[in-house]
């Protein structure tokens, strides 16, 4: 500082000699001293608050940015919670849909079992009808009770088939509702996945912003450390200036004492006056220096407070950053878990859909086989109906022949009755003749007894007459027996033909009803097959659209 003072002081006109003491004032004026000692301090003082102001403003900006980022992060966290809740709801809906699908599959199995049991009962009824037909063909008497039981079984099987159809329609409706419910659940899961993707993108952006904020905070820390270093340098320079100033004042006082001793009193007075003036100026300068020092200390306190606040804010920002980083890591782990669970669910869903599709294809194959079997059964029933019609035609012909034979037998019976009546009339005539002959014989006997003359008949004539009467009686009895036997046989044949005709008509009606029911069941099964195939096709299209 002495060198600076010597450079800035104006040179004296006289030349300096060896051994001569410099009696010039160290400062020309208080203003020069203030300008000398205050330039650096004022410049440093002015630059330091500006830098501190800039650093505090940047810290405030960073804090506001951190607050905004934290708010955005909380919003994204809330969205993630909402997405997780929607995902859980979608999973619950999927589990409910799975349960309904299992219930529907169980119901379908029960319907198939009931249908199979109805088909088995139908087969047993058909076998029973065939057995009854065989018994009818072999002439065994009809079992009306067994026919009634078979008819009731057939009616019960038809009722079971109708109930199975109604249950199948209900199952189909519940299946449609379950498919709609499943589609809504899949849509919700897709929306949740999209929300998760959007939120993951936002989380990545926030992680980038947090890394940028971290870099900015690091730069702020470096700037704060630099400011502290500059402040320490400024304080050190001020201390050095104070020491230089003290040494300069001490040297000036020493020089004044030496000058007072060596020089004249006038010169000493002038020097004392100058010294007083300089001391007053020095006091003023000290006062100003003290004020400057106090203001500088105040600014230093303000800067230290601001730096402390900035460090606290930086620490809070670092803590927030750590919490945000841990939250981001946890969210990333949750996202990974969610992705893994979603992939597992998709894989399980695909496997379940494949298994269900294979089961449905097998069920369709079984249904098609059952339909083919029912068609063949319907064709067989039609063939049996045709055979029954042919048998009925033959039975009609037999009944017509029996009717013709009965008419012929009636005609023969009428002829026999006429012959019997003629024989009876002839017998009556013979009896009357015998009576007349006997009366005549008696009258002749009486006349002979009275007149003494006798009419004699030979034994051969009497035997021939007696034999003729017996033969006529035997022939009449024989003809009557043969006619009664023929009438009994004709009545039996007529009753058998009527019974066979009635049984065949009943069997034909039952076969017609059975064929109609078989045709209806085959048509309903075909319609159910078409509906199931259309439902499967629609379901596959929906699955393809959802997968796309």
From Swiss-Prot:
Organism: Arabidopsis thaliana
Assigned keywords, A-Z: Coiled coil
Superkingdom per UniProt: Eukaryota
Chain intervals with Basic and acidic residues compositional bias: 430-448
Coiled-coil parts of chain: 71-544
PANTHER family, per database record: HEAVY CHAIN, PUTATIVE, EXPRESSED-RELATED-RELATED (PTHR32054), WEB FAMILY PROTEIN (PTHR32054:SF42)
Protein name: WEB family protein At1g12150
Coiled coil is among the record's keywords: yes
Family: Belongs to the WEB family.
Pfam families: WEMBL
Region feature Disordered, mapped onto this chain: 430-455
